[in-house]
Amino acid sequence: MTILNHTLGFPRVGLRRELKKAQESYWAGNSTREELLAVGRELRARHWDQQKQAGIDLLPVGDFAWYDHVLTTSLLLGNVPARHQNKDGSVDIDTLFRIGRGRAPTGEPAAAAEMTKWFNTNYHYMVPEFVKGQQFKLTWTQLLDEVDEALALGHKVKPVLLGPITWLWLGKVKGEQFDRLSLLNDILPVYQQVLAELAKRGIEWVQIDEPALVLELPQAWLDAYKPAYDALQGQVKLLLTTYFEGVTPNLDTITALPVQGLHVDLVHGKDDVVELHKRLPSDWLLSAGLINGRNVWRADLTEKYVQIKDIVGKRDLWVASSCSLLHSPIDLSVETRLDAEVKSWFAFALQKCHELALLRDALNSGDTAALAEWSAPIQARRHSTRVHNPAVEKRLAAITAQDSQRANVYEVRAEAQRARFKLPAWPTTTIGSFPQTTEIRTLRLDFKKGNLDANNYRTGIAEHIRQAIVEQERLGLDVLVHGEAERNDMVEYFGEHLDGFVFTQNGWVQSYGSRCVKPPIVIGDVSRPAPITVEWAKYAQSMTDKPVKGMLTGPVTILCWSFPREDVSRETIAKQIALALRDEVADLEAAGIGIIQIDEPALREGLPLRRSDWDAYLQWGVEAFRINAAVAKDDTQIHTHMCYCEFNDIMDSIAALDADVITIETSRSDMELLESFEEFDYPNEIGPGVYDIHSPNVPSVEWIEALLKKAAKRIPAERLWVNPDCGLKTRGWPETRAALANMVQAAQNLRRG
């Protein structure tokens, strides 16, 4: 029984973000469709070859996506919303881009599909839309075309296909409501057709992803698995693939399925390998997800060997990444600025492939010498002074309940804030960032590369902040922001100014579409050596009589959008960050900043996948926010911002944050999200986002007014704010001016009644 290895997927964007650049060039009309397609082919060929050279036996095909793999699956099944369809019924790459972005080089612009987080990761998918009576058919053959590509290059491949039940689970019904699970029998023939086509190509194994099987699914959904997979069996071997959690709670459902193998995440799940082995059918292959696909840490391979060795030789076994390597940067070897000690602690996607090769070889041979050598740096890290800061640990241990309480309740604070700011009804503001122009990016890059001295850099940033204030005053906004010209990313910026973080040069991971982020890495205890945001906030406030918001990223979001340590709990990291940012709130307040926004867009996405684990997480997540904010005086207004959220099941926790104002992303869901706040009788102020900043389309005054009137039916108008869904850094100035002008006009119209 020779053990093989494989990955569940590989990063798509390219080491230098080649895919992002090609997409954006095509969208801007600066390159042709053929040129875009050529970049995709080149990246796929390179990535297959890199995995093969690193020692991977079975290469994933179908993990590449032009925007998002859930959207790719939707097109495969012919699931195209009516507003995005081509007149002749055909489907092409622009159809895909219109669904994702609301517009493309061809076709009519229309509202983009809703976007939300992929399970509890920082990747986003486009939510499939279902309407009653819709038809499904194989319309987008990208998977088959890419399999042909890989086979022509001589690779041994394993196609990757998002499973039918997970795909349905991830979608939403639009219009007349019905049970979306009723569509299952309509999509299975398309899956059968795809599997038949793969069988014709001589494919032995297909990785069929059903991560919904790690959730606490309703019984009807669990019951749907057996008939669905009865319909799919027989043409190729199916590797039922799960990740992000363990499968033990749903193992009875899984073991009844007519599949030939099961992949389990042995990093994030709590499944015991020996118990799994006992419960799985003896002829099934077990794919052991031993290498963390979601983090950047070098694996302790001696530990991984011990974890799996007891079942070696007892069943067919593969070793694998826990999930797709999509969530990891590509290659550590190009990181030239990390010092040798810290660099020795990490492994990116290509290094994880190498880890899988080392592990496979050791399991096949029994020789573990190479594993011990590989694991030595991560074992040495446990005693590094770079990791432990006694002062931080002491401060954390001294936290009391009082440290997470504002001095007075919201009603008292609101009165003090009204007296201080005297804002009109329907106050207008933005979420924080303004367009990151080429000039701004060049300025930061020149400074980073040493081509610009500190004085000239600061002069340049000051000018961009001045322009942002002038623009907002001209537009008539009520509460201003400084625009964040100095910030490359809302998390990276704070990480750069906090001890305990390190940064990469090329550690890009895909967030959605062409958007990539370069998450900081938490390597040790977190503290704040000096004020971070005070200087620029104070400068911006000096230029206007209107209030300027101080802008902070909250502790849970910094945690969730960074690569965390694996040697302490997430709670510990979040509270260390909260204490550091608490000092920032105090310093902003002392500098005369009266409104401070602490963004927590990631609060919900950090939820454990199983509801039974939620309470513990929400308790420390809320406490971290309150530790951060509680130092503020009564007349300092604390805002928070959240996006991509379904709120109804965590409203208690959102209220417990005790922010004076919460701004939320609601426009893509047509204000549906406000139902939760209405039903809960949310007591504080709310700014429901009135337009979608992820699309370049400019909303009309009438559209915004209609949304605000809809909001006012649910929330008293005196508690409503008017703002976009999210920050504006990815937009251009022309559409930003136009959209904000319409937003301000809509608010003014409503004030006049």
From Swiss-Prot:
The keyword Zinc belongs to this UniProt entry's keyword annotation = yes
Q: Which InterPro entries match?
A: Cbl-indep_Met_Synth_N, Cobalamin-indep_Met_synthase, Met_Synth_C/arc, UROD/MetE-like_sf
Cross-referenced Gene3D superfamilies, in alphabetical order? 3.20.20.210
According to the record, the segments passing through the membrane are: none
What does the record give under GO molecular function?
5-methyltetrahydropteroyltriglutamate-homocysteine S-methyltransferase activity; zinc ion binding
Annotated EC: 2.1.1.14
Which residues, by range, are in coiled-coil regions?
A: none
Highest taxon listed in the record's lineage? Bacteria
Identify the metabolic or biological route this protein is part of. Answer: Amino-acid biosynthesis; L-methionine biosynthesis via de novo pathway; L-methionine from L-homocysteine (MetE route): step 1/1
Enzyme superclass (EC): transferase
Q: Where does L-methionine bind?
A: I431, G432, S433, E484, D599
User: What CDD domains has UniProt attached to this entry?
Assistant: CIMS_C_terminal_like, CIMS_N_terminal_like
Q: Which SUPFAM superfamilies match?
A: UROD/MetE-like (SSF51726)
Residues the entry annotates as binding Zn(2+): H641, C643, E665, C726
Q: Where does L-homocysteine bind?
A: I431, G432, S433, E484, D599
Function, as annotated, reads: Catalyzes the transfer of a methyl group from 5-methyltetrahydrofolate to homocysteine resulting in methionine formation.
What name goes with this protein? 5-methyltetrahydropteroyltriglutamate--homocysteine methyltransferase
> Species name for this entry?
Escherichia coli O157:H7 (strain EC4115 / EHEC)
Gene (name only)? metE
